[in-house]
């Protein structure tokens, strides 16, 4: 008897086209055993129905994926307890304060985003084409936004950003540099909490709560961790999404022209760009804490399950004509780009506004934006938790 050869994930590092294997799996085997880069076996779910089942069932735990001996999607780049960061925040009684601080409705925040986007684009126009929309627009805009929301100096953003190229690696083996960067960034945020000049944003609020006797049970480590994780996860998610959204938009000149002519349609456009977004390179990992029936498979306690977002978001059973961007879908926000259930992304509203304002500013300044190289010449980062091109060269 020959052993079954397991499919290896991820299928592709490219964020501009969905692998053919996704549709085939969703049709034939919406739950299928695969092998991760660590050599561990996992169940890959690829239909909308099964993906939502796993994300909404609390017996599939994100926290337990970091447990000692658990099958791994990839090596941890943060301390194990940080995997359950939002759970730790809620347990400490800090969720309300954090959510209030990261709303895009904070006074002056949207104008700050517009001003920053316009300034970045003006610099690119002054320098002339070709311009790099990832390194000189999407990522700096995301970095500036999160410095503003955190209430930390803008000049500190690039230093913190440099940690992310290692923090979000997808490696089979431990990454020594990740701990070095983590310890340095924690030390930075601890210093921010002690800085009397930091009075605004999330860190200003955490600094006040840290001195409140009602929060004496919360460790300084957790207060600092909130700052580090919010910056890291927020910047990498918003920056990579805007980058891949711009690629999708450039590939669809009719949509680009429509959103330029009718900017009021940009929110609907962003929702569809979120749905077809391929920036999340690996399936969302969950560990079964009980035996659970998923489709035709009984997932056993202790087994790893991977939720394939592009499988769900391109499922024609839920989104007819899934490869087409349709601004009048009846269920526009039911995609899983921000997850689902207890780990739904807390920064979803902020991420939407970042993309909406960034795209609106770009189309005003560069209405004819186009790739400056053939799309197959884009170099996609490999072994990374996000699908991003190293550069996004454009002309206009």
Curated annotation (Swiss-Prot):
GO terms for cellular component: cytoplasm. Its cofactor is heme. Heme binds at residues 286, 343, 345. Changing residue 279 to A: Has little effect. GO terms for molecular function: carbon monoxide binding; cyclase activity; heme binding; iron ion binding; monooxygenase activity; oxidoreductase activity; oxidoreductase activity, acting on paired donors, with oxidation of a pair of donors resulting in the reduction of molecular oxygen to two molecules of water. Keywords: Cytoplasm, Heme, Iron, Metal-binding, Monooxygenase, Oxidoreductase. Substrate binds at residues 77, 85-86, 237, 301, 385. It is found in: Cytoplasm. The keyword Metal-binding applies. Changing residue 386 to I: No significant change. InterPro entries: Cyt_P450, Cyt_P450_B, Cyt_P450_CS, Cyt_P450_sf. Its EC number is 1.14.19.70. It is an enzyme of class 1 (oxidoreductase). The record marks 346 as: Important for the position of heme. Changing residue 338 to H: No significant change. Inhibited by clotrimazole, econazole, ketoconazole, and miconazole. Changing residue 237 to A: Has little effect on the heme conformation but significantly alters the environment of the heme and the affinity for azoles. It catalyses: cyclo(L-tyrosyl-L-tyrosyl) + 2 reduced [2Fe-2S]-[ferredoxin] + O2 + 2 H(+) = mycoclysin + 2 oxidized [2Fe-2S]-[ferredoxin] + 2 H2O. Pfam families: p450 (PF00067). The keyword Heme applies. Changing residue 346 to I: Considerable effects on the heme macrocycle conformation. Mutant leads to a more planar heme conformation. Disulfide bonds: none annotated. Catalyzes C-C bond formation between the carbons ortho to the phenolic hydroxyl of cyclo(L-tyr-L-tyr) (cYY) producing mycocyclosin. Can also use cyclo(L-Tyr-L-Phe) (cYF), cyclo(L-Tyr-L-Trp) (cYW) and cyclo(L-Tyr-L-3,4-dihydroxyphenylalanine) (cY-DOPA) as substrate. Was identified as a high-confidence drug target. Belongs to the cytochrome P450 family. This is Mycocyclosin synthase. The lineage of its organism: Bacteria, Bacillati, Actinomycetota, Actinomycetes, Mycobacteriales. The gene is cyp121.
